[in-house]
UniProtKB/Swiss-Prot annotation:
It comes from Helicobacter acinonychis (strain Sheeba). Catalyzes the synthesis of GMP from XMP. GO terms for cellular component: cytosol. The lineage of its organism: Bacteria, Pseudomonadati, Campylobacterota, Epsilonproteobacteria, Campylobacterales. InterPro entries: Class_I_gatase-like (IPR029062), GATASE (IPR017926), GMP_synth_C (IPR001674), GMP_synth_GATase (IPR004739), GMP_synthase (IPR022955), GMPS_ATP_PPase_dom (IPR025777), NAD/GMP_synthase (IPR022310), Rossmann-like_a/b/a_fold (IPR014729). Its EC number is 6.3.5.2. The active site is at C78 (nucleophile), H163, E165. Keywords: ATP-binding, Glutamine amidotransferase, GMP biosynthesis, Ligase, Nucleotide-binding, Purine biosynthesis. Homodimer. The keyword Methyltransferase does not apply. This is GMP synthase [glutamine-hydrolyzing]. It catalyses: XMP + L-glutamine + ATP + H2O = GMP + L-glutamate + AMP + diphosphate + 2 H(+). It is an enzyme of class 6 (ligase). It comes from the Bacteria.
């Protein structure tokens, strides 16, 4: 096991993800985690992540110096490397030539972490400071055109100025694997088969004879949660699917059919009127999310009372993932809150259930692998992510039945055309957004003043970062023509070419 100390880098989660892809378990803790807590995890090595601060600044992020008393191998990445240099007596200063993006790495000395790594490769840089002087006992093992000390080592302490965790670093995964396997002595024991077995055992012990209400949205995450729980506790699971009126076209029927195939009893609740009445007049995104979160719990509590004769319901299960938690609140380090997730920040304080989130520490690709391990169909597992608040966060401004219908039809056309063109499985996520703006148009000889639809498609590997999908002009033209001709109330279609960062994948 490797413990990653998070200093606030946007890429910290990718470090854990890359190691897990290699079968090595990695866990993330904030940089200020106590040495005692780290020691309890019994790690075989530490990785210090990158971060936005400068080691020479007054407010620099510094971990407990006691981490060095653990006598564990340490790998510092970007800020982590600069911290090591500063701590051991070297010098770090603001770089005259800052590096952002791809750079050419050249290995200049053999090292165990470079075993099997090409002598020259491209790596990903993202730093404004650089190492000026190495501490005594350290050696430079790689360089780049603008970084003479691009990789350093001293015994079992290593530093990398670049980000091996980012996919653009061609040999990054191999370097991280070498550190974990060859330096730290880790073994490849992490995988979804082991996770499924251990998690089912944990769930059985935690839940015991209690009953669990599982919130099913129809998405991959909640479906995998329900399947995992059903394997673990059988009839003590009450799977509840709430039709809040904010679903995609034909969503309810698809979900019911899929759960029937999985042989999991599903309780469907028609709560459309309740949700829409509470959302009436509400246009602020965060308020919409919180209203939906609170209304979900209200509906679940009512459903729980219907089942009380069969045993008390103590737990509420949700399909919360790592990125959900990261975007809601900084639980792993000094990153900043972006927006609340309906599974986390939107929950009311008066909630009576104990929360259980089996997937909380998993990335999306791991959830799909887990689902495959549990027997969920591949076609379903490859469905694009869908937000818990549903179309409410894809309708900018106030939500209404007419807007929902309009968005459902447009979204259905977009997805249908992606599948016809064999593009659906090539993009990470695709959907439509109904904008809160009207524009002038012409239909026949008549002037129109109607809604605009925005098409959104992104490429990503885990949702932490994303770039817009480069869909062909002819394809976009076809989708636009269909939407404006077939969907009443739409006279303009635009395509979102914003990446994440600076934007988020969803608009609200």
């Amino acid at each position: 096991m490797i413990v990653v100390l998070d200093f606030g880098s946007q890429y910290t989660q990718l470090i854990a993800r890359r190691l897990r892809e290699s079968g090595i378990y990695a866990e993330i803790v904030p940089f200020f985690e106590s040495t005692e807590n780290i020691q309890k995890k019994a790690p075989k090595g530490l990785i210090l992540s990158g971060g936005p601060a400068s080691v020479y600044a007054k407010d620099a992020y510094t971990p407990s110096e006691k981490i060095f008393d653990l006598n564990l191998p340490i790998l510092g990445i970007c800020y982590g490397m600069q911290y090591l240099v500063d701590f051991f007596g070297g010098a770090v200063a603001c770089a005259n030539e800052q590096e952002f993006g791809k750079a050419a790495l050249e290995i200049i000395q053999d090292s165990v972490i470079f075993k099997g790594v090409k002598a020259k490769s491209l790596v990903w840089m993202s730093h404004m400071d650089k190492v000026i002087t190495l501490p005594k006992g350290f050696t430079t093992i790689a360089k780049s055109p603008n970084s003479l000390h691009c990789a350093i080592e001293s015994g079992k302490v290593f530093g990398l100025q670049f980000h091996p965790e980012v996919i653009q670093s061609e040999e990054g995964g191999k370097i991280l694997e070498n550190f974990a396997l060859l330096v730290c002595g880790c073994e490849k024991t992490w995988g979804m088969q082991n996770f499924a077995q251990k998690e089912m055992t944990r769930l059985k012990e935690k839940i015991s004879d209690a009953r669990v209400l599982c919130a099913v949205s129809g998405g991959v995450d909640s479906t995998v949660v329900a399947t995992l729980l059903h394997r673990a506790i059988k009839d003590n699971l009450i799977a509840v699917f709430v039709d809040h009126g904010l679903l995609r076209k034909n969503e309810k029927e698809k979900v019911q059919a899929m759960f029937k195939d999985l042989q999991i009893p599903l309780n469907t609740i028609d709560a459309k009127e309740i949700f829409l009445s509470k959302l009436k007049g509400v246009s602020e995104p965060e308020l919409k999310r919180k209203i939906i979160g609170e209304t979900f719990i209200e509906v679940f509590e009512k459903e729980a009372k219907k089942h009380h004769l069969k045993g008390k319901i103590e737990f509420l299960a949700q399909g919360t993932l790592y990125p959900d938690v990261i975007e809601s609140v900084s639980v792993k380090g000094p990153s900043k809150v972006i927006k609340s997730h309906h599974n986390v920040g939107g929950l009311p304080e008066w909630m009576d259930f104990k929360l259980i989130e089996p997937l909380r520490e998993l990335f999306k690709d791991e959830v799909r692998l887990l689902g495959k391990e549990l027997g969920v169909s591949q076609d379903f597992l490859m469905r694009h992510p869908f937000p818990g608040p549903g179309l409410a966060v894809r309708i900018l401004g106030e939500v209404s039945e007419s807007k929902i219908k309009c968005l459902q039809e447009a979204d259905f056309i977009f997805i249908e055309e992606l599948k016809k063109a064999n593009l659906y499985d090539k993009v990470w996520q695709a959907f439509c957004v109904l904008l809160n703006a009207h524009s002038v148009g012409v239909m026949g000889d008549n002037r129109t003043y109607e809604n605009a639809i925005c098409l959104r498609a992104v490429d990503a590997s885990d949702g932490m970062t994303a770039s817009f999908s480069h869909l062909g002009h002819s394809f976009l033209e076809k989708v636009s023509n269909r939407i404006t001709n077939e969907v009443s109330g739409i006279n303009r279609v635009v395509y979102d070419i914003t990446s994440k960062p600076p934007g988020t994948i969803e608009w609200e």
